[in-house]
Amino acid sequence: MGQHNLTVLTEFILMELTRRPELQIPLFGVFLVIYLITVVGNLTMIILTKLDSHLHTPMYFSIRHLAFVDLGNSTVICPKVLANFVVDRNTISYYACAAQLAFFLMFIISEFFILSAMAYDRYVAICNPLLYYVIMSQRLCHVLVGIQYLYSTFQALMFTIKIFTLTFCGSNVISHFYCDDVPLLPMLCSNAQEIELLSILFSVFNLISSFLIVLVSYMLILLAICQMHSAEGRKKAFSTCGSHLTVVVVFYGSLLFMYMQPNSTHFFDTDKMASVFYTLVIPMLNPLIYSLRNEEVKNAFYKLFEN
């Protein structure tokens, strides 16, 4: 029995999103549409904000990188989910699982701090409009994004290497529909308390630090809006922040719901719903919420097709 438990794994089995056969085809169609909208929407945002000189501003610089992260996050997860709807056995190879974990962590952690950088950008735009381009210089924008990518890559590689250099034993069934660190830890033969502690510490740090930046930025924005004498100015300020605030609430809410509940109350179905939201639904909604209703983006879109 012990020899069997220490057998080197070559593949994992992922849990299904649903075990009801009649829902397989409808869900495949839904997730295919979600993924196609995600790819088209985010690629459009990347191309428009790169090609149109009117969109070469700090705000659209952040939106371009958010679109890149959303596209990457969705592409890491969704194609495998779609494949699992049409195969009898939902397997993923050992190295593919490691790669999926690394890229997923890199993209999801990057999104935390891109959203917080966008909150700071909105704070500067509303509270210091005359100094906006001085404070949010091109150099600062590149430094902020560079630090985010370096930090997220470091953390993704650290957890992936730590987990996949240890031995897995027992069942090869991952209690999730993609490779994440939380469901992989109980499958390790050796004591995973160190990795589990690091996972909790980094998760809490990522959540709290990025959320505090968002919270403080919006508190200062709210104070500035309350001091505005013009109703038109207040309306414009609220419309500027409304889209970002909506996505922040949904994104952080789904993550908090999944990771901050006690282990004893974790249910696979509720975790699946939260995961679907921040890995598949939010990447689809972000380009729509942030930008496709924006007149500057619409003008850039029409200009691109006219040329």
From Swiss-Prot:
For whether the record's keyword set contains Repressor, the answer is no
Residue ranges, Extracellular compartment? Answer: 1-25, 76-99, 161-197, 259-271
Topology in the membrane? Multi-pass membrane protein
Coiled-coil annotation reads none
> Pfam family example for this protein?
7tm_4
Q: Keywords, A to Z?
A: Cell membrane, Disulfide bond, G-protein coupled receptor, Glycoprotein, Membrane, Olfaction, Receptor, Sensory transduction, Transducer, Transmembrane, Transmembrane helix
Q: Which residues lie on this side of the membrane: Cytoplasmic?
A: 47-54, 121-139, 218-237, 293-307
Report the protein name in the record.
Olfactory receptor 8K5
Specify whether Mitochondrion is a keyword of the entry.
no
Compartments (UniProt record): Cell membrane
Give the species. Answer: Homo sapiens
